[in-house]
Amino acid sequence: MLGFVTGVLAISAHVIVSQPNEHSPVVVARETYGLRDVIFRRLRSYETDTASARAEEGTSDIEERSDHEIPPDFYKRLASTSTPYVANLSHKAQIAAQALRKDAERSKGALELLKKYAELEGKMDAPKEEKNHVDRLKAAAFKEWNEKGLNLDQVRVLFADNKRRTSKYENLIEKIVGEYEKS
């Protein structure tokens, strides 16, 4: 029975780790992977604690014991020590997902502004409506950044979608940051 429970826990821990989740940062994934290690460490420590009893019986593994030979409090102790750890991981994952959503919303305006600037940069005779649209986006973004009290370095970070894309628009980013500094 314990072999079955151990197998189920190992498989579920592997599934948790192997399933991609875009809202879960690497730190939470590492801690989730650590859950499997915690469970196996606790199983090994239980085996170590009862090593002398097994040596007398001639058994080497807890999996070799039948259900009635395993102390009834073993599952209870394992669950009581593992459940808070799992609950804590779930809470951390929720907090991390909320932070990622906030960051995505915050940088969304910056990336949209950069995209519109790039579109206007290529056009010599851009229609007045497009220029007005960019000005409205810029005013809204600058207002939001001023309310949050962002400094110039923090504004540059908002545009850091990925390295390749950022280096392509470096001049435009500096232009936007310069305009933000003047405002």
UniProtKB/Swiss-Prot annotation:
Q: What stretch of residues is annotated with the motif RxLR-dEER?
A: 41-65
Q: Which residues are glycosylated?
A: 88
Any signal peptide, and if so, which residues?
1-18
> Does the entry feature the keyword Iron, yes or no?
no
Query: Which controlled-vocabulary keywords does the entry list?
Result: Glycoprotein, Host cytoplasm, Host nucleus, Secreted, Signal, Virulence
Q: What does this protein do?
A: Secreted effector that dos not suppress the host cell death induced by cell death-inducing proteins.
Q: What is this protein called?
A: Secreted RxLR effector protein 41
This protein's gene is called RXLR41
